[in-house]
């Protein structure tokens, strides 16, 4: 990839904390029965985001919700464009039938990752409802997918990149917009 021309901080560590608190509150408000809630993080950054949201929901409501990790590598329709990577391990230890599943991802762009995730989820049961939570929605959809919970709407140019940094993975919390 080319050298970045411009890097702009979109969310600081404190902004990110507040955004996750708001997302967790919105998920709680829209979920009838929290005991049936499962957060499925999509590799890579969606996994720690799902864990952070689960902790925040526990803080808010005093209930542990189910958390899993979903690798959608073999469900993608654009492998020829993005290339095949070594798959991560999907970790879903419960039947999703009848559950309220919230797919969690860091950034939604074209929508293809979420389309693949919807296909993958069906292998683990038939949820009552599937919702989508994203930290950043940057637009430019190529498929008709719309998130239910959005931390930050961020109009971008197609060639720009949104980078999400999380303490447990990257040593810092921030969201940056990178222009090339």
Swiss-Prot record:
Q: What class of enzyme is it?
A: transferase
Residue numbers covered by motif PRPP-binding: 101-113
Q: Keywords assigned by UniProt?
A: Glycosyltransferase, Transcription, Transcription regulation, Transferase
Q: List GO BP terms, alphabetically.
A: regulation of DNA-templated transcription
One of the record's GO molecular function terms:
uracil phosphoribosyltransferase activity
Give the matching PANTHER family.
Answer: BIFUNCTIONAL PROTEIN PYRR (PTHR11608:SF0)
- What protein family is recorded? Belongs to the purine/pyrimidine phosphoribosyltransferase family. PyrR subfamily.
> What function does this protein fulfil?
Regulates the transcription of the pyrimidine nucleotide (pyr) operon in response to exogenous pyrimidines. Also displays a weak uracil phosphoribosyltransferase activity which is not physiologically significant.
Name this protein carries in UniProt: Bifunctional protein PyrR
Organism of origin is Trichormus variabilis (strain ATCC 29413 / PCC 7937) (Anabaena variabilis)
